[in-house]
């Protein structure tokens, strides 16, 4: 107020005589004279304003030199002299206006939920590190970089992304660092023959190629197409098939994805509001000469001087010369423009006189007065502005300035106040609002996934992946749901916001759902579909779907909701682009904007700001307007190549851009502060801000009871409306009908729709059906509410209820082009025409009892209708001679009724009342009718019918579909007049019918006991009114009512996914699917047992042989193991055997018909055997071999007398058959493209049929040969003698494989084995000279030549991930047999218990230890918890204990064999223990350790007396086995690629075999060492003494793991625990010199005693229910300690163990496996036996020491085993200690450095990890390559190449080597080291990158790798 009245004071300005340069000014008495400005301007202010603390002069001269006023005690004295309330000090506001009240303030005590800014402000703690500068000094955003989790990758900028996004081909880091230094990309796998490969590698079905839909997501499936689906009127078709607005043609913008809309353009068609660039592009006219290069060629900025004056800002004045100056300089007496236009009379400048001065009436100024160059200049205080009179001031309305406040603004005189909506809070700047709640997240669709990004951090997370083509999305924050549309799948889906629980919401009736919006208040889902031109609504689960808006919609795109106001907003970029709105019930529709729009894409609502924002991809602009469309303004009009979607949050806009593949942001008011949030995205689509304030709470108008509505409750303004799903009539204001009574039914290729006649809106509704590809024909049956349709893409006939439920395929085989369909509602029959097979067929309405009615003289039959009253059916024929025919519904009385003036007769319809037949002719462009006999023909409609297709009648109307007008029309059925269009703009219209419930009833004899027919009863025009018919391929018997039981003579063939038959009993060829209810994936070979009527087939994908009856029943698998690629199969119906070839295993096998007694017949010198045939009477089998040297061979049916018949001029001999009548062999060769014939000895060879394109299966019956052909996809027939008369039996059969011809009437031959199986106990097999007895694989035949042993005696047992197999060593074939143990996933280790006959195994996928009998039965889990990676397993067959290593937990454990009494034996100083072995007789436990320092250790069976045996020159000690006879250990080293051995003390070490590829496990039997090898995928063996005679036992086996020998010689011997468990209550552990009792780690229900014999033996039902081993007839030696003992490390205390020794695991610690002490109360016999045993052991020990001492004197100094012996030797009572000699580094390739240096261990962990991955995940790596890879950390693999000289010296000093040995070893050492450069192989020089492997990653099978 002071400034207001002070401005009214009078003042006088007295200037000195002279110019302003005198710098002297004088004001009146009542005024203060301000300092003269640099321009000589003088200013006078009222005197009372001097020294008042305000800078009134503007230069502080009125406040200079002032004596500060005295403030009251309650006030604060500012530095500028101003007095303010003391309570305002340090409150965060600048009240002094010089900030002195906020200086030197103590830190404000912020609340607990606040963050203290460095400037003293307090903000919410949630705002700290959220990316917003809330403090104003950015102190709240000075944050430490977030740590990435183990499953994340850190980008170079510090942000975190999902680990699997690293090097995935997509740039996920903002700086692109995730795609740097990546290995070469792996090319996408090729698609199969029935798929199309998109540009970016994705495979889609080939039928989607060039179908007009963007199925790939990048339109690559629609490029280079010869034809496309037509575009709508007003649209231009791009070369790719995309349809765009026709007005965009030649407008300078490339709107087509291939830029074809801008090709061959002469002139651009720019509008009057556009400027045409030199390039032809059209831009806004207002952009002309605006200083921005909008044309991209700068042509819009050229010649601008003649285009008119530039535009000045609103606060500027435009001078005549074009210059812009500030408005305040207007009429100030100064020539600021330069042309004096700012001071001209035209500007109404008041004349200035010398008398005017600020001292007189304040110069006439209302507030401030200044003298500038001798003239008065009025100014105003802050918050005011000068009016046009230049004197008075008026209040500035800051609230009118856009963006001054973020949300709300209240203006007052000279001031204003900002405020925020509920849910927001003012920031410290007092102008901007911040949303309360969590940090905002941008949720966006990226086409193939949906991701989240933090807008201020650019951190990136994946929500959903593996999507097809996600476009639109929205979320429901309260329900934590995300919704999205997929325009490739044409689906709307939803999931939880954590990415779980993905489910379909809307799956039918969608074509291009480009917009999606969630009503979070009323729980509704709205979407737009530019393909159907609709806006629809449904519940959140998709229920009660309703078409809301459909009229005057062209291409609705984006949609946004305002549930609080009950309004929908949407964009439409059709021919008339616009933005519209309506109530959420569809009422009150209105236009928001319809000018200056081209391609309005994204749309969003700022709920707090009450505005809408949208992007226009054509105009390259972001605009905004009020919600009613007013105050429209462009926010951003530059730098927007192709904006797609937009969202808003707080004061920022975020949008996606297709061209830049980025997410961008800018200020929503000004468009400034543009920033790229994310770039290099895959294809950014829709975007939303995920935050609760984007979905503010609102009133639910429908309440808790859905508004009382039965179906939909939709908000309408502030009220609501009850609505019904589309097509359902409304009964009253709240209720809808529950069903439909009548509706128009029509097909549209990809869907089937209905238009309800129960309502007036006539909008069509999609019946929710799945997998509709190309629907053509329709019909219906109102009795069960079924709708039937044919699909010419899937070649099926299906049905469902009219609401889409109960969908079922009723006919799915032997269809090629089912074009017509008719339902006989009287007899419940289904009739159809097939234009591909030229047939008319019939079946029951469920598809059963199908038969062919008419197959002759048909040429592309099309539509069909039936008239059950008269017993006739009618059909149109589209062929060379178009016609309309009729016949009885049983195919009798066939006649042509219309044959002239027809071109393309399409739809048919019968008017049952007037007995008329109607048809539509697309060629004649007419609809006609005639009598049912063809008489009285008349044209009903003969004009304006471009292409009628479907036709139907209802009531007085006729309805038809038209392909060209894309519409459904109707007219009067009698006159053809009163035409109207029901629906238009419907692509791909097909058949049409009216569903109603008034079909006339008809009586028929078929209604009574099926007319007496055994199968089909059909209506007939005959006097009886019906006739009986049989299913396809079956003959009707003479009684005319009964059908024969089945086919007698037929072809049966495999078609990969099914088995089919073609009857040869009838005069036509029709294939019938054998209805086998089993999964088939790749059925190849086939055979038939005519005796039992069963078919046998092999499946090379499922790896099994199965069988079933010919009617599909009694199906079962007979062989399920040991099969790889079974290409050939033959059934010996006489001998009751099945034979097969296996290309994968290169074997020929035989078994009984039930798969039992399986035997390998031929296994040597086979190379891809394929077809096989039998000649039982001759005892021969014949087969083709497809290998490198193709051939035809023969042998006896027992595998004997093998002979090569033909081995020249063969390529790919596929099919094979024997003609017994002519004694000839016939075969088909796909490479030579011939079918050839020879006699049974291979002579007289000649060509029978040539050329044939790609024959596969071949068979023979009577006078004909039949074969399948891959190229023609057909079955062919020819004369077997001449090869002539080749005909097509069946065509259009993709996936054809084997074929057999069967005549069940032919008698079987004589069985050579007779009725008693030839006296054989197992197999009796024919041979040319009779027969032979044989045994199943691996079992020996006894000397009598008839009887087989019950099982093999000695055999190998090995694991191969998903299987356990056996190889008998009793027989010579060495073929593997699967042990049928169920539920195997990833078997690693195994062992066998010969007492119970059980195999024990570990499964690291399930983390269990299990056991089972060898026949696969009695499988049970022994250990089912607490395991991580059990790599080693061993059975103590004497004490009945089980031992295992756990690499994941670094433990060795034991339990009873049933898993009880579990106990950890060793759990320290272990680093990845692997293999384990036990020696019960010695009481020893051995294991390998794969860790940082590899070693092999030994302990007692209780874990005590632990000792390192080998710790030098080891890489990856994998397998371990014991030779109990020679008392030696053998192990394989997968890194050093060798097999070694040593004695039980680790001495006398010897390399047995070098240069093995990658051995994993090994075992020993007799003189052989057997091992498995990962790289060679084989089992091999070598002589254990010499290392020679290396042989491959089994080859080509994936995933080989453990291997053991089962033999009576392996598990022998005993110990004290072998009798009654040693008297122990729980665990009994034998040791080297005694035994101990132990208790489990977790007590059980039985008391545990450490004293043997104290507890009575447990009953057999307890955990000790284990059998004792069968012991030899010798007394066991048992030795017990009489006192409790504690084991410690050698030489006394543990403290004397060095740190280095501890690292090497050389110290036995006192806390390791402290054994329990035996008790005192032992039986006397035990004591006596113990004393005798002590004496015996002492004698043996002494003898052994003497022997070794003498032996060392005579040992050959050159023996290699001494080279690797331990460096020190001690007595048996002492622990061996090995000094830690430094290992040499491979890097500098030095053998030995005297000075030593730090110890170097193997840098092999990374390669080990890779092997670990192979162990758990099923990888099979090329290990030669793996070893060459470099470490990601720069380390090189170091190999222990040379022995250390110190090691030799230590051996010598310890006495283990004499002088000769020492000298010899030193010489060898120097020799080895000098040759290290040549001896070192390249694969020793690298290591692998760290894979980050964890044990938990396990896969169930190799197929998952």
From Swiss-Prot:
Residues 1872-1881 have a biased composition (Polar residues). Residues 21-1723 are extracellular. The gene is Lrp4. It is a single-pass type I membrane protein. Residues 1-20 form the signal peptide. Belongs to the LDLR family. Disulfide bonds join 27-44, 34-57, 51-66, 71-83, 78-96, 90-105, 110-122, 117-135, 129-143, 148-160, 155-173, 167-182, 191-203, 198-216, 210-225, 231-243, 238-256, 250-265, 270-282, 277-295, 289-304, 312-324, 319-337, 331-349, 358-369, 365-378, 380-393, 399-409, 405-418, 420-433, 702-713, 709-722, 724-736. Gene3D superfamilies: Laminin, Low-density Lipoprotein Receptor, TolB, C-terminal domain. InterPro entries: 6-blade_b-propeller_TolB-like, cEGF, EGF-like_Ca-bd_dom, EGF-like_dom, EGF_Ca-bd_CS, Growth_fac_rcpt_cys_sf, LDL_receptor-like_sf, LDLR-related. It is found in: Cell membrane. This is Low-density lipoprotein receptor-related protein 4. Homooligomer. Interacts with MUSK; the heterodimer forms an AGRIN receptor complex that binds AGRIN resulting in activation of MUSK. Interacts (via the extracellular domain) with SOST; the interaction facilitates the inhibition of Wnt signaling. Interacts with MESD; the interaction promotes glycosylation of LRP4 and its cell-surface expression. GO terms for biological process: amyloid-beta clearance by cellular catabolic process; dendrite morphogenesis; dorsal/ventral pattern formation; embryonic digit morphogenesis; embryonic limb morphogenesis; endocytosis; enzyme-linked receptor protein signaling pathway; generation of neurons. The chain crosses the membrane at residues 1724-1746. Glycans are attached at residues 264, 498, 719, 901, 1077, 1415, 1467. Residues 1882-1905 have a biased composition (Basic and acidic residues).
């Amino acid at each position: 107020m002071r400034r207001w009245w002070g401005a009214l004071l009078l003042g006088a300005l007295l200037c000195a005589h002279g110019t302003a340069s005198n710098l002297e000014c004088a004001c009146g008495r009542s005024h203060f004279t301000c300092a003269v400005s640099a321009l000589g301007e003088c200013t006078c202010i009222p005197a009372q304003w001097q020294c008042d603390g305000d800078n009134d002069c503007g230069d502080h001269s009125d406040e200079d030199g002032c004596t500060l006023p005295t403030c009251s005690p309650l006030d604060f004295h500012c530095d500028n002299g101003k007095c303010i309330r003391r309570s305002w000090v340090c409150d965060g506001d600048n009240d002094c206006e010089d900030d002195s009240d906020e200086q030197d303030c103590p830190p404000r005590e912020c609340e607990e939920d606040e963050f203290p800014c460095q400037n003293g402000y307090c903000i919410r703690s949630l705002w700290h590190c959220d990316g917003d500068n809330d403090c104003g000094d950015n102190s709240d955003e000075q944050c430490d970089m977030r740590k990435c989790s183990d499953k994340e990758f850190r980008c170079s900028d510090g942000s975190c992304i999902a680990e699997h996004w690293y090097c995935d081909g997509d740039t996920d880091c903002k700086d692109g660092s995730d795609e740097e230094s990546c290995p070469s990309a792996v090319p996408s796998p090729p698609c199969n023959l029935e798929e199309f490969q998109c540009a970016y590698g994705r495979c889609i079905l080939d039928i989607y190629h060039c179908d007009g839909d963007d199925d790939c997501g990048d339109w690559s499936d629609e490029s280079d197409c010869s034809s496309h689906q037509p575009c709508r009127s007003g649209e231009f078709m791009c070369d790719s098939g995309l349809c765009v607005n026709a007005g965009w043609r030649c407008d300078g913008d490339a709107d087509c994805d291939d830029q074809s809309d801008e090709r061959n353009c002469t002139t651009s068609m720019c509008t009057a509001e556009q400027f045409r660039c030199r390039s032809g592009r059209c831009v806004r006219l207002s952009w002309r000469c605006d200083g921005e290069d909008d044309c991209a060629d700068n042509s819009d900025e050229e010649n601008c001087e003649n285009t008119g004056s530039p535009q000045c800002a609103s606060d500027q004045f435009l001078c005549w010369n074009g210059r812009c100056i500030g408005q305040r300089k207007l009429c100030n007496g100064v020539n600021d423009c330069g042309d004096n236009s700012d001071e001209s009379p035209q500007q109404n400048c008041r004349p200035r006189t010398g008398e005017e001065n600020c001292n007189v009436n304040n110069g006439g100024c209302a507030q401030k007065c200044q003298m500038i160059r001798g003239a008065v200049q009025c100014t105003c205080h802050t918050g005011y502005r000068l009016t046009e009179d230049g004197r008075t001031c008026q209040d500035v309305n800051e609230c009118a300035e856009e963006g001054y406040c973020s949300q709300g603004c209240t203006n007052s005189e000279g001031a204003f106040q900002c405020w925020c909506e509920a849910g927001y809070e003012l920031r410290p700047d007092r102008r901007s609002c911040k949303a309360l709640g969590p940090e905002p997240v941008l949720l966006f669709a990226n086409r193939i996934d949906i991701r989240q990004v933090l807008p201020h951090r650019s951190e990136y997370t994946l929500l959903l992946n593996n999507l097809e083509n996600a476009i639109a999305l929205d979320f429901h924050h309260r329900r934590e749901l995300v919704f999205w549309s997929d325009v490739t799948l044409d689906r709307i889906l939803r999931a939880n916001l954590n990415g779980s629980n993905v489910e379909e919401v809307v799956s039918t009736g969608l074509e291009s759902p480009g917009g999606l919006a969630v009503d979070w208040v009323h729980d509704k889902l709205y979407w737009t579909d530019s393909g159907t031109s609709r806006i629809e609504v449904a519940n959140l689960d998709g229920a009660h779907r309703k078409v809301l808006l459909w009229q005057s919609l062209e291409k609705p795109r984006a949609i946004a909701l305002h549930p609080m106001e009950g309004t929908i907003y949407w964009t439409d970029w059709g021919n008339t682009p616009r933005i519209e709105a309506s109530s959420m019930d569809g009422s009150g529709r209105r236009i928001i904007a319809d000018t200056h729009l081209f391609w309005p894409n994204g749309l969003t609502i700022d709920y707090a700001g009450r505005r809408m924002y949208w992007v226009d991809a054509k105009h390259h602009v972001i605009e905004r307007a009020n919600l009613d469309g007013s105050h429209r303004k462009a926010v951003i009009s530059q730098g927007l190549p192709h904006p797609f979607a937009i969202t808003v949050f707080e004061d920022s806009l975020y949008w996606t851009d297709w061209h830049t593949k980025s997410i961008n942001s800018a200020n929503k008011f000004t468009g400034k502060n543009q920033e790229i949030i994310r770039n290099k995205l895959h294809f950014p689509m829709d975007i939303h801000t995920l935050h609760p304030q984007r979905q503010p709470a609102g009133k639910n108008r429908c309440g808790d009871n859905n508004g009382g509505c039965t179906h939909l409750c939709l908000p309408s303004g502030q009220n609501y409306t009850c609505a019904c799903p589309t097509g359902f009539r409304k009964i009253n204001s709240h209720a809808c009908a529950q069903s439909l009574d009548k509706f128009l039914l029509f097909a549209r290729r990809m869907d089937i729709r209905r238009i309800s006649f129960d309502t007036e809106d006539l909008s069509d509704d999609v019946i929710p059906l799945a997998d509709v590809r190309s629907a053509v024909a329709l019909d219906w049956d109102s009795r069960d509410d079924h709708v039937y349709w044919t699909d010419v893409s899937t070649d099926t006939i299906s049905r469902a209820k009219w609401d889409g439920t109960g969908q079922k395929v009723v006919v799915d085989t032997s269809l090629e082009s089912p074009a017509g369909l008719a339902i006989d509602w009287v007899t419940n029959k289904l009739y159809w025409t097939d234009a591909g097979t030229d047939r008319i067929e019939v079946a029951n309405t469920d598809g059963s009892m199908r038969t062919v009615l008419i197959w002759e003289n048909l040429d592309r039959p099309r539509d069909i209708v039936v008239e059950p009253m008269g017993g006739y059916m009618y059909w149109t024929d589209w062929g060379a001679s178009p016609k309309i025919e009729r016949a009885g519904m049983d195919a009798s009385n066939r006649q042509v009724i219309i044959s002239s003036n027809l071109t393309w007769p399409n739809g048919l319809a019968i008017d049952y009342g007037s007995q008329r037949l109607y048809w539509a002719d697309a060629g004649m462009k007419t609809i006609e009718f005639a009598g049912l006999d063809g008489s009285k023909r008349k044209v009903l409609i003969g004009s304006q019918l471009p292409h009628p297709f479907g036709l139907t009648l209802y009531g007085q109307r006729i309805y038809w579909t038209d392909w060209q007008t894309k519409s459904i029309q109707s007219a009067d059925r009698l006159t053809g007049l009163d035409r109207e269009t029901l629906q238009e703009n419907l692509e791909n219209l097909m058949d049409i019918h009216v569903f109603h419930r008034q079909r006339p009833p008809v009586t028929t004899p078929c209604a009574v006991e099926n007319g007496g027919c055994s199968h089909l009863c059909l209506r007939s025009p005959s006097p009886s009114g019906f006739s009986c018919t049989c299913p396809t391929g079956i003959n009707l018997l003479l009684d005319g009512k009964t059908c024969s039981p089945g086919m007698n003579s037929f072809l049966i063939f495999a078609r990969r996914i099914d088995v089919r038959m073609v009857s040869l009993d009838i005069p036509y060829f029709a294939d019938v699917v054998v209805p086998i209810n089993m999964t088939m994936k790749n059925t190849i070979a086939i055979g038939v047992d005519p005796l039992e009527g069963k078919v046998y087939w092999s499946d090379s994908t499922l790896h099994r042989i199965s069988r079933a009856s010919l009617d599909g029943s009694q199906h079962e698998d007979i062989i399920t193991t040991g099969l790889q690629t079974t290409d050939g199969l033959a059934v010996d119906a006489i001998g009751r055997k099945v034979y097969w070839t296996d290309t994968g295993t290169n074997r020929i096998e035989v078994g009984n018909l039930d798969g039992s007694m399986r035997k390998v017949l031929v296994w040597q010198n086979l190379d891809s055997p394929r077809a096989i045939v039998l000649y039982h009477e001759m005892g021969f089998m014949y087969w083709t071999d497809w290998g490198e040297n193709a051939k035809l061979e023969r042998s006896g049916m027992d595998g004997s007398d093998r002979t090569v018949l033909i081995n020249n001029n063969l390529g790919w001999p596929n099919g094979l058959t024997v003609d017994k009548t002519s004694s000839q062999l016939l075969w088909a060769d796909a490479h030579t493209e011939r079918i050839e014939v020879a006699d049974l000895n291979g002579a007289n060879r000649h060509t029978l049929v040539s050329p044939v394109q790609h024959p596969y299966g071949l068979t023979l019956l009577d006078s004909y040969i039949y074969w399948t052909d891959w190229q023609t996809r057909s079955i062919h027939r020819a004369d077997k003698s001449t090869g002539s008369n080749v005909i097509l039996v069946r065509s259009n059969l993709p996936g054809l494989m084997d074929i057999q011809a069967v005549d069940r009437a032919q008698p079987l031959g004589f069985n050579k084995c007779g009725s008693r199986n030839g006296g054989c106990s197992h197999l009796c097999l024919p041979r040319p000279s009779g027969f032979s007895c044989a045994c199943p694989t691996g079992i020996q035949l006894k000397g009598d030549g008839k009887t087989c042993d019950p099982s093999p005696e000695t055999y190998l047992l090995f694991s191969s991930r998903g299987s356990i197999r056996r190889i008998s060593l009793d027989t010579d074939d060495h073929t593997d047999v699967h042990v049928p143990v169920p539920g195997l996933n990833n078997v690693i280790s195994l062992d066998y218990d010969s007492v119970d006959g059980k195999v024990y195994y570990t499964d690291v996928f399930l983390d269990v230890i299990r056991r089972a009998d060898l026949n696969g039965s009695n499988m049970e889990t022994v250990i089912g918890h607490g395991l991580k990676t059990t790599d080693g397993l061993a059975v103590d067959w004497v004490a009945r204990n089980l031992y295992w290593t756990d690499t994941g937990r670094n433990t060795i454990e034991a339990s009873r064999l049933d898993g009880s009494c579990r106990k950890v034996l060793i759990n320290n100083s272990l680093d990845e223990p692997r293999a384990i072995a036990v020696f019960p007789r010695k009481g020893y436990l051995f294991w390998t350790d794969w860790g940082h320092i590899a070693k092999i250790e030994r302990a007692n069976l209780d874990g005590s007396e632990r000792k390192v045996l080998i710790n030098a020159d080891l890489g990856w000690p994998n397998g371990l086995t014991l030779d109990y006879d020679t008392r030696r250990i053998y192990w394989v080293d997968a890194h050093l690629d060798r097999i070694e051995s040593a004695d039980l003390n680790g001495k006398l070490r010897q390399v047995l075999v070098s240069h093995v590829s990658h051995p994993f496990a090994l075992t020993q039997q007799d003189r052989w060492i057997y091992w498995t090898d990962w790289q060679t995928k084989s089992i091999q063996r070598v002589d254990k003494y010499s290392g020679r005679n290396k042989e491959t036992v089994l080859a080509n086996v994936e995933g080989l793991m453990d291997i053991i020998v089962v033999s009576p010689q392996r598990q022998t011997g005993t110990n004290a625990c072998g009798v009654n468990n040693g008297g122990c209550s729980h665990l009994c552990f034998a040791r080297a010199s005694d035994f101990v009792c132990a208790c489990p780690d977790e007590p059980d229900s039985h008391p545990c005693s450490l004293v043997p014999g104290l507890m009575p033996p447990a009953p057999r039902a307890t955990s000790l229910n284990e059998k004792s081993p069968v012991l030899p007839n010798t007394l066991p030696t048992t030795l017990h300690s009489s006192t409790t003992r504690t084991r410690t490390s050698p030489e006394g205390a543990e403290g004397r163990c060095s740190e280095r020794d501890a690292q090497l695991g050389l110290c036995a610690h006192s806390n390791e496996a402290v054994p329990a002490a035996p008790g005192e109360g032992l039986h006397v016999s035990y004591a006596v036996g113990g004393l005798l045993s002590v004496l015996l052991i002492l004698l043996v020990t002494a003898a052994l020491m003497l022997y070794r001492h003498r032996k060392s004197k005579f040992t050959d100094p050159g023996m290699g085993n001494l080279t690797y012996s331990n460096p020190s030797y001690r007595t048996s009572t002492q622990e061996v200690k090995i000094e830690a000699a430094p290992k040499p580094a491979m890097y500098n390739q030095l053998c030995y450095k005297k000075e030593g240096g730090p110890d170097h261990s193997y840098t092999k962990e990374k390669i080990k990890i890779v092997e670990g991955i192979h162990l758990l995940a099923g990888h099979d790596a090329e290990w030669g390559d793996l070893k060459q890879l470099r470490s990601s950390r720069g380390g090189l693999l170091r190999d222990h190449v040379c022995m250390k000289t110190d090691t030799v010296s230590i051996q010598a000093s310890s006495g283990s080597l004499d002088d000769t040995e020492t000298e010899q070893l030193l010489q060898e050492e120097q020799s080895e080291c000098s040759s290290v450069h040549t001896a070192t192989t390249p694969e020793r020089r690298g290591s692998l990158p760290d894979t980050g492997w964890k044990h938990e990653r396990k896969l169930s099978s190799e197929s998952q790798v």
